[in-house]
């Protein structure tokens, strides 16, 4: 206790008395733990050492670090912080008996003298000569001149000083070993803490290795010179060599985790958190480098403008960085809308490819690394509409495990209600903003806040005739919303009852085959949003027929990859469910299968009926003479045979499309599901009308 007498007043802090909460045993545990955290040579003022303590390491039981600090303040306020004469005499007695301890060890008459470094040898040799030549110079100026002269010395002359230093250094080491043998009482090392040494970063490991090599070549180098030289070397180190030290750092961290967990079992009072043990020793750049070599795909630009800028900047290395963005913005504005749309499509395609590549990358990673990658993907703000991607699936799954089970039923219900409602209609201003946001972002260098502010002002100052087009679009969107809402309300109850209620964290189903993946892609990118649902599905079918077998195989492979990942995620999710939730999930799925079978059984037939109806309509238009009943009968027979042939030839694709319909609930919004149900009803009515038409023909015949 080396503080001054005034330390008593300085050390006082207002802290609430909580003696009732702290038992004597707890207070003694706190003091004992504080002793273990004190430095080996505690020669500083108590206030200094106290300020350097890591109070979080003192936490134990239910006492946090701040509570431990508060309790220490209370206890220390009750203890005097000045020394009595008796204590000083005891210290003085110890000093007289053992005068050569601590930092004064080198004052022992027999302690070996350290050899001078090569530079100091040169300095001592030349100093007197230069002092006579330049008597007006100060010691500092002389030192600067001699330092410069030494650096300019030829290697041959410099080697003489280095060899002398190395010879004397060997003598010093021999004499030091002899001194240790003769004076073991003076060489007692302070007891080292048994806390495992923290793992080093890749740069620290590399520095320790290279430092030894550097000192062999530059024995006279100072610590600053070594740090500067090696720091420059590290910044220029090739990625492959840097990766070697990254792997070594990761291995060391794994070893540290194992040793530290054993240490925690022996010292439970330290209450070290799991985060403190598993904290990464890699920087963000080092982590990205390792991921890149492991095969992690590069994240694509977030939008078409960013993609355009990235492509343009690759050829603008000679242009100053301040001017690059200005040039990009100007050139983007000169592009036609068609060219901008092409970049938009290209950007969307890259995002899809990235998701597939990321899935493949995740499959080869251990679970711990998967969680890290998914957390990083979540942090950078993946779009909500892409929650069906594997990364967001698993991130949601992790979040579900962390959240409390209480109130889950209410959350599920609220989520279901939100999912049932169609997309809210947009205002005229919102539709206009969506169409011009790219240009404004380019103008303000991707500063969204500024762009939105200027867009609002532009809209307010816009003339009414310029707004008419957007007002009409908003009115159409409002009608769409009302139509979808009325369709949803008029949907029969059994169809809704058959729908699957989502469990929290449940992974979304992957496409079952190539056709489903193909249609999912077309529906999600918004390319067919201008078409009604029925025409949308017809267009998807016709496009599927037109693509080559190679492209179909590509979509089939994508679907298989997603299926494999889905099964892995689904198994993990099921294991995390409680017994009660698992039983409820299985029961619901059983009921869903039954209801789905009843509702969707005639789907393949209804397709044939729709086709036959369209053929009948064409026949009715061509056949203007309704009195010729025999010709009608012949045409009906031919139609039926054609229908049979077409059903045989497209049976495989129908089966794929049938599976697509089974998963429509997972792939589309509820309004689309309702419209599909309406399609089924229409197909049913069309089948009845066609059959009645056939019967009327036969009657007339």
Swiss-Prot record:
Record's compositionally biased regions (Low complexity): 683-695
Pfam families: HMG_box, HMG_box_2, HMG_box_5
Compartment list: Nucleus
Gene3D superfamilies: High mobility group box domain
PANTHER family, alphabetized: UPSTREAM BINDING TRANSCRIPTION FACTOR
Feature: compositional bias, Basic and acidic residues: 408-426
Cellular component per GO, a single term: nucleus
Name the record gives this protein: Nucleolar transcription factor 1-B
Domain of life: Eukaryota
GO MF term set: RNA polymerase I core promoter sequence-specific DNA binding; RNA polymerase I general transcription initiation factor activity
Upper taxonomic lineage: Eukaryota, Metazoa, Chordata, Craniata, Vertebrata
Gene source species: Xenopus laevis (African clawed frog)
Principal location: nucleus
Function: UBF recognizes the ribosomal RNA gene promotor and activates transcription mediated by RNA polymerase I through cooperative interactions with the species-specific factor SL1. It binds specifically to the upstream control element.
Biased composition (Acidic residues): 615-682
Region (Disordered): 1-21, 382-426, 584-701
Subunit architecture: XUBF consists of 2 polypeptides of 82 and 85 kDa, encoded by the same or closely related genes.
Keyword field: Activator, DNA-binding, Nucleus, Repeat, Transcription, Transcription regulation
Biased composition (Polar residues): 597-612
DNA-binding region: 112-180, 196-264, 298-362, 422-489, 508-574
GO BP, sorted A to Z: positive regulation of transcription by RNA polymerase I; transcription by RNA polymerase I
């Amino acid at each position: 206790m080396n503080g001054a007498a005034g330390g008593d007043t300085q050390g006082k802090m207002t802290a609430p008395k909580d003696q009732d909460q702290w038992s004597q045993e707890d207070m003694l545990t706190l003091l004992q733990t504080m002793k273990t955290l004190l430095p080996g040579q505690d020669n500083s003022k108590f206030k200094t050492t106290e300020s350097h303590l890591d109070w979080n390491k003192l936490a134990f039981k239910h006492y946090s670090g701040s509570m431990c600090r508060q309790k220490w303040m209370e206890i220390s306020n009750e203890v005097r912080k000045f020394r009595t004469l008796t204590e000083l005499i005891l210290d003085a007695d110890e000093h007289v008996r053992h005068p050569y301890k601590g930092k004064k060890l080198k004052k022992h008459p027999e302690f070996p003298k350290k050899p001078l470094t090569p530079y100091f040898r040169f300095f001592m040799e030349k100093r007197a000569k230069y002092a006579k030549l330049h008597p007006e110079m100060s010691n500092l100026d002389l030192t600067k001149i001699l330092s410069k002269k030494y650096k300019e010395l030829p290697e041959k002359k410099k080697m003489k000083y280095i060899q002398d230093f190395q010879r004397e250094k060997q003598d010093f080491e021999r004499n030091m070993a002899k001194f240790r043998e003769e004076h073991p009482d003076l060489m007692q090392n302070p007891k080292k803490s048994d806390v495992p040494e923290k793992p080093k970063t890749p740069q620290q490991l590399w520095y320790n290795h290279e430092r030894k090599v550097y000192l062999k070549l530059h024995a006279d180098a100072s610590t600053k010179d070594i740090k500067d030289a090696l720091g420059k070397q590290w910044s220029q180190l090739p990625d492959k060599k840097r990766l070697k030290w990254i792997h070594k750092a990761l291995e060391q961290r794994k070893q540290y985790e194992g040793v530290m967990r054993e240490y925690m079992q022996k010292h439970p009072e330290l209450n070290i958190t799991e985060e403190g043990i598993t904290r990464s020793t890699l920087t963000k750049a080092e982590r990205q480098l390792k991921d890149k070599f492991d095969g992690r795909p590069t994240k694509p630009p977030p939008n078409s403008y960013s993609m355009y800028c990235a492509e343009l900047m690759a050829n603008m290395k000679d242009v100053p960085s301040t001017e690059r963005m200005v040039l990009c913005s100007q050139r983007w504005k000169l592009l036609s809308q068609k060219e901008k749309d092409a970049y938009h499509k290209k950007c969307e395609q890259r995002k899809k490819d990235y998701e597939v590549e990321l899935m493949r990358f995740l499959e080869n990673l251990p679970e711990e690394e998967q969680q890290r990658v998914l957390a990083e993907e979540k942090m950078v703000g993946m779009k909500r509409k892409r929650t069906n991607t594997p990364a967001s699936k698993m991130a949601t799954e992790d979040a579900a495990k962390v959240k409390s089970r209480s109130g889950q039923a209410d959350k599920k219900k609220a989520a279901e209600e939100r999912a049932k409602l169609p997309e809210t209609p947009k205002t005229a201003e919102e539709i206009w903003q969506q169409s011009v946001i790219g240009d404004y972002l380019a103008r303000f260098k991707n500063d969204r806040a500024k762009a939105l502010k200027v867009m609002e002002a532009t809209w307010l100052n816009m003339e009414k005739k310029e707004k008419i087009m957007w007002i009409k679009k908003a009115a159409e969107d409002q009608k769409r919303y009302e139509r979808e809402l009325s369709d949803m309300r008029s949907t029969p109850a059994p169809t809704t009852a058959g729908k699957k209620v989502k469990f929290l964290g449940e992974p979304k189903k992957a496409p079952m085959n190539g056709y489903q993946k193909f249609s999912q892609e077309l529906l999600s990118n918004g390319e067919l949003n201008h078409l009604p649902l029925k025409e949308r599905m017809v267009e998807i079918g016709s496009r599927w027929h037109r693509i080559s077998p190679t492209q179909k195989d590509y979509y089939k492979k994508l679907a298989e990859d997603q299926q494999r990942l889905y099964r892995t995620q689904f198994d993990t999710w099921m294991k995390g469910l409680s017994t009660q939730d698992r039983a409820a999930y299985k029961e619901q799925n059983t009921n869903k299968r039954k209801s789905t079978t009843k509702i969707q059984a005639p789907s393949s037939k209804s397709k044939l009926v729709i086709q036959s109806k369209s053929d009948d309509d064409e026949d009715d238009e061509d056949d203007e003479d309704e009195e010729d009943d025999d010709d009608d009968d012949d045409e009906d027979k031919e139609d039926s045979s054609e229908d049979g042939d077409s059903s045989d030839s497209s049976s495989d694709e129908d089966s794929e499309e049938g599976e697509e319909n089974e998963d429509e609930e997972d792939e589309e919004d509820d309004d689309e599901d309702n419209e599909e149900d309406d399609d089924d009803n229409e197909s049913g009515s069309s089948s009845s009308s066609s059959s009645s038409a056939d019967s009327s023909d036969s009657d007339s015949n």
